[in-house]
């Protein structure tokens, strides 16, 4: 009934159109389609939702911005605020649901767990 479509962080290897086509195919066989992909803009989330995606998971990795900067030295993933705002863009793009999490263990797991909960709380209040 449900499937999770997963990509890496490379737009080159799995661009939004490719993911959209995968959603269209999956929609023929599954009731719910989840995505675990790199963060995209609101228009792209709208497109993916129109292709059949229902929800999105984006791992923040860590909410410790100093640690995050040491893990991502270059490229699109380096922009912490863009990743932080991914769930909000997904909801604005029409997704029915979003998921939050840090990769516990990259930094103090207690602080990241609390920050994940506060991230959800923050978005619920917007």
PLM region spans:
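Core AdoMet radical
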Residues: 1-17, 25-90, 96-101, 106
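Charged helix-capping and loop-helix junction motifs
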Residues: 16-21, 114-117
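Oxyanion-binding "anion nests"
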Residues: 98-101, 114-126
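Nucleotide-activated chemistry modules centered on ATP-dependent adenylation/adenylyltransferase
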Residues: 110-111
């Amino acid at each position: 009934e449900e499937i999770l479509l997963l990509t890496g962080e490379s737009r080159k290897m799995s661009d939004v159109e490719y993911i959209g086509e995968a959603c269209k195919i999956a929609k023929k066989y599954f009731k719910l389609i989840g995505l675990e992909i790199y963060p995209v803009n609101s228009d792209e989330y709208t497109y993916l939702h129109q292709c059949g995606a229902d929800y999105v998971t984006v791992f923040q990795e860590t909410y410790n911005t100093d640690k995050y900067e040491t893990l991502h030295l270059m490229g699109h993933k380096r922009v912490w605020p863009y990743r932080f705002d991914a769930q909000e863009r997904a909801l604005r793009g029409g997704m029915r649901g979003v998921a939050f999490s840090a990769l516990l263990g990259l930094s103090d797991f207690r602080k990241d767990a609390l920050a994940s909960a506060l991230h959800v709380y923050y978005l619920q209040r917007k």
